[in-house]
Amino acid sequence: PYATFPAAALGWVISEEKFFKVKFVDYLKLRASWGINGNRDITNYAALSKMLAEKSLNTDLNGNPITIPTLEINTMGNKKLKWEKTEAYNLALDFRLFNGRLNGTVETYYMSTTDVLVNRELPTITGYKRVYANLGEIRNKGFELSLSSTNMKQHNFEWTSNLIFSLNRNKIITITGEKYDVFDKDGNFVGQKEPDDKTNNWFIGQAKDVIWDYKILGTWKIGQEEEAAKWNQAPGDFRLEDVNDDGLLTDEDKQFLGYKTPRFSWTLSNTFTLFNDFEFSFVLYSLWGHKGSYNLAKHADHIEDRCNSRDIPYWTPENQLDDFARLRSAPAKGVDYSVWFDKSYIRLENIALAYKVPAKFLKKTPISNLKLTLNVKNAAMWAKDWKFGDPEDGMRSQRIFTFGLNMTL
């Protein structure tokens, strides 16, 4: 489909105005922009119905394993699929201060995305698994700061820094737009409300990456056998909060427990130059305020239960942990839930050391320039609670040492 995406931008260099007399400000510019962007980043033929061909393993009448080809309906078609549109407003201030010692940009933005393209999960009763659809509206607002500074500059020493900080907040405003009537306990009409989409974990007024799950209150302890038995559990199993205290665990007991993506991030780099020959630099960055699930902490029906290859702690009567269940633990009345841990972390991403051999030492050689380098990638990482591999991908990240020699003949 075709669509139109207009945009406009304005800029004002305040520091060039005659009335501007602030001596320590070298440059000051105010920028504002507005525009509508389009997105149709979906797979080819996403708007068409699809069949899924698979193979299932079964046995014949004699008990021999056989493979049975299957064909099932997978994705529902949607001929009305259209562009996702984002209307964005940006306001920024660029500056340079103290004879160029400090440069930076402060920017804030507001975006409203409508007709959001989503691969929506469908109820089983429809006969389909998923459908690409345009749904609702999501609003984003955020703040970004970037700074570049020369902290110290002497004849034989220079220290420079760069900082980038950003945060973003999003909120689901509407999903389908359909509303239902709301009545009070006496049957009086009090208004209308749009329902949440619990199947896809989308909730009006919440972020699209919000975590909606049962809250874990630790584990059942020795001496609580009778209470745990009411939930078909035993000491060492995770204890879930029954919010309305009705003896059941339903959607009414689920809570908003945090977010799956970082609430803010920052990157800091520093470079030190000594005698124009030695250069040392390092880069730190951090993602903060998000959570990730680690369901091996349940110790339920996994190979790790039997070999514990990942050295995962587990509850015992002698060591009654709250963050990890007993081996072969049981869920409360069979409900499904995840175990969430804080994934906030700070990483020393890179350390670099370089030495440029002075020209006077190369006079009697055919080499005109010689530079030696040492680089360490993923030098160190500190995580608040996450101890299960790299918080970015869950794997055991490598520390890489690189030696280099650059020369010009």
How would you describe each model-predicted region?
Residues 20-85, 103-138:
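Solvent-exposed loop/turn elements at secondary-structure boundaries
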Residues 26-32, 102-104, 159-161, 268, ...:
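Transmembrane beta-strands of outer-membrane beta-barrel proteins
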Residues 135-140, 185-221, 319, 331-333, ...:
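C-terminal beta-signal and terminal closure region of outer-membrane beta-barrel proteins
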Residues 233, 287-372, 376:
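Extracytoplasmic gating/loop element in the C-terminal half of outer-membrane beta-barrel translocons
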